[in-house]
UniProtKB/Swiss-Prot annotation:
Catalytic activity line of the entry: 4 porphobilinogen + H2O = hydroxymethylbilane + 4 NH4(+)
Organism in which the protein naturally occurs: Ruthia magnifica subsp. Calyptogena magnifica
Record-linked NCBIfam families: hemC (TIGR00212)
One Pfam family hit: Porphobil_deamC
Protein's name in the database: Porphobilinogen deaminase
Entry's Gene Ontology molecular function annotations: hydroxymethylbilane synthase activity
Listed Gene3D superfamilies: Periplasmic binding protein-like II, Porphobilinogen deaminase, C-terminal domain
Cofactor remark from the record: Binds 1 dipyrromethane group covalently.
Gene it is expressed from: hemC
GO biological process per UniProt: protoporphyrinogen IX biosynthetic process
Amino acid sequence: MNKTLKIATRQSPLALWQAQNVKIRLEKHHPDLTVILVEMTTKGDQILNSPLSKIGGKGLFIKELEVSMMKGITDIAVHSMKDVPYEIPQGFKLGAILKRENPFDAFVSNDFSSIDDLPQNAKVGTCSIRRIVQLKAIRPDLKILDLRGNVNTRLKKLDKGGFDGIILACAGLIRLGFESRIKQQISDQQSLPAVGQGVVGIEIRENDTEILDLIKPLIDVETTYMVSAERAMNARLEGGCSVPIAGFALIDNEQIMLTGLVGNVDTGVILKEQILSHVSQAEALGVELANKLISLGAKDILKN
C-alpha cells in the first residue's frame, strides 16, 4: 500500500532545495512512499525591511510550518538548523539531524578576493550580529550595512552595487549552485559559525513514532552529537538571534571539541572558550562551555 508524507517548507529557493533533497532521500529509502512538498510563506519571509533581532528572531521562519503540522496538514518540517530556536515548542521535537555540509561563512564580492583585500571603509552587507561582531574584530574600519532576503536576493543586491562584499553561509551557496561566487571561505578563527550552521534538521510531532521510523535512515550520528553540544550551549546561554553567539563542534576519534563565543557588538568585547570531551557527553559539554563563558561575563553581555 502506498503511503504519502507531506513536508512543510518555506518557499525560498534554499528551503525548497533542502526539502526536495529530503524528499529524494526518503523516497529512495522507502520505494512505496510518495513525498509531497507543501510550500508556505512565513512572517520571516514577509518582513524584509527590519533586522531579524528587532522583529522576533529566527523563530519567525518556522512557526507557520509548525502550525501546519499541528493541524495535520503536513507531517514533517525541514529546517536549516541555524534557524531553529533552542526551545522547541511543546508537542514537537527534532526527529532527525542530517549530515553536516560546509559549516563556514563565505565572503562574496565582485571586486575583491578576500576580507583582507577590501579597501578602508569598504561597505559589507550582512544581517547577522554574530558575523558583525567578528567582522569588526578583524576589520574595525568596515561599514557594515544590513542585508536581508534569501540567497538569490542578496546576490542580486550585491550585483546592483551598494556593497563591496557580502557575507553568506557557504552551505547555502553550494546547495544552490553558487559555489563559484565564493571568493573566500572564512576560517572559524576569523568567523566562528552559528550554532547548527550547514546542518539540515527534520522537525516532527512529538509522539509520531510512525514518522520517526520513516526518517530514521537520514540521521547522521556524528552531526547529531555536534549539534547537540552546540544547541545545549546556546540553550544555557539563552541565546536568540538578537545576541552575537557562535558555537562550533568538531569530532575526531570519538572526542568532541566545542568552541563557543559571545560578543558585544557595541564595545567589541569577545569572549571565546574551547573544551573537549567524549562524544557521549556532547550535551553536558555544551552546558559546561556555556558556564565557562558565563563565569567570564557572558550574561552581562547578553543582558545588554
